Amino acid sequence: MLEDIQRLIQSQADFIISQQLPSGAIPWYRGGITDPWDNVECAMALDFSGQFSEAVLAYNWMRDTQNPDGSWYSSYHNDKPQNLTKDTNFSTYIATGMWFHYLTTQDLDFLRYMWPTVEKGINFALSLQQPGGEIYWGLSENNEVWPGAILTASSSTWLSIKCGIKIARNLELDKPDWNK
């Protein structure tokens, strides 16, 4: 049974790799869009299966496509922005992926290399935090705030900020504002 599970995991990793673009982006399907959240999910699946170099390629794509404000656009097609909305859940999820990558590889150098990307992503989301603590969902393509906090996105954002705090501690950095 264990061998069957290992074969299944490897076949899924092989499928993800077969979809990955040379840039590191992992679209939903061949010729489809890439969204930052799913790209990180796929990178974590690659880490889980031991395909670390392909996971690093996906994380580097995240670093290379991050907007100056720390966000990512909601979708890309062949590495070009397609949907210009900016989701706070997408901007923080890189921290979850990087924490998982570190746990599976213990590669502190890569964690340090990716830190600016993680930090900017979390700071983008926190820039939309409201006095009550909720973090608004995102910005429209015209940079207008989308008021409201969706439960699933908020849960992912909360987990990602916690992962970012763990990364900061491992890098001996202090991010007290992230605990608010």
Locate the predicted segments by residue.
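Low-complexity, Ser/Thr/Pro/Gly-enriched N-terminal "stalk/linker" regions
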Residues: 1-37, 48-72, 125, 132
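Active-site beta-loop-alpha junctions enriched in small/polar residues
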Residues: 39-40, 77
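Well-ordered alpha-helical scaffold segments within catalytic/enzyme domains
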Residues: 1-2, 40-54, 93-110, 156-173
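The feature captures the catalytic groove of carbohydrate-active enzymes
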Residues: 14, 21, 25-28, 74-75, ...
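Helix-terminus loop motifs that line ligand-binding clefts
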Residues: 50-122, 126-129
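Generic alpha-helical secondary structure signal
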Residues: 3-14, 53, 108-112, 116, ...
